[in-house]
């Protein structure tokens, strides 16, 4: 009789471990999928910026320092992609550099009237909005995973099953305001 009780307890523990493991895998996979959605939008942003720089380069001959800052920030952001902890600050620096460039574009009437510049500004704004939505979904997914991982009884098995914490995709406080792009 006690043999069957021990077997029953072992089966219950095994079933519990399987349930915890499968729940954590599902939550972690959702977070990884959400990050890949951010990655797609960041790549789109990284691809748009050289096009914008190329279009404005000729008209902004003596503003080379600004253009160089934008390209350097873009290259740093590309290098940080794939790592949420590094991507946040790198993308924030890219946002600052891009805002500086777009601010200078406003000073050049011929650029403000250029259809290519208008289209690139619009695409950049749309991409920024998509990044914001993807970042929110990712952070919600990571929060769900981390909460599940830290909740009882999963906390008893999560670390031993190889489930470490996931990083949120955060931006510095100075970058939390919406970018303003004038399309006139």
Regions found by a protein language model. Name each.
Residues 1-184:
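A helix-centric hydrophobic-segment signal that preferentially recognizes long
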């Amino acid at each position: 009789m006690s043999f069957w009780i021990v077997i029953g307890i072992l089966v219950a523990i095994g079933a519990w471990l399987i349930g915890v493991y499968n729940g954590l895998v599902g939550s972690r996979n959702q977070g990884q999928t959400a990050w890949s959605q951010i990655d797609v939008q960041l790549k789109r942003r990284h691809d748009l910026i050289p096009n914008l720089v190329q279009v404005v380069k000729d008209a902004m001959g003596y503003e080379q320092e600004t253009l160089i800052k934008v390209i350097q920030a873009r290259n740093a952001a590309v290098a940080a992609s794939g790592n949420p902890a590094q991507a946040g600050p790198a993308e924030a620096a890219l946002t600052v550099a891009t805002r500086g460039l777009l601010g200078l574009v406003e000073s050049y009437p011929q650029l403000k009237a250029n259809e290519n510049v208008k289209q690139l500004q619009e695409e950049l704004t749309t991409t920024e909005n998509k990044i914001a939505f993807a970042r929110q979904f990712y952070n919600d997914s990571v929060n769900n995973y981390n909460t599940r991982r830290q909740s009882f009884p999963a906390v008893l098995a999560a670390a031993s099953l190889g489930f470490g914490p996931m990083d949120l995709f955060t931006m510095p406080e100075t970058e939390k305001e919406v970018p303003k792009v004038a399309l006139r």
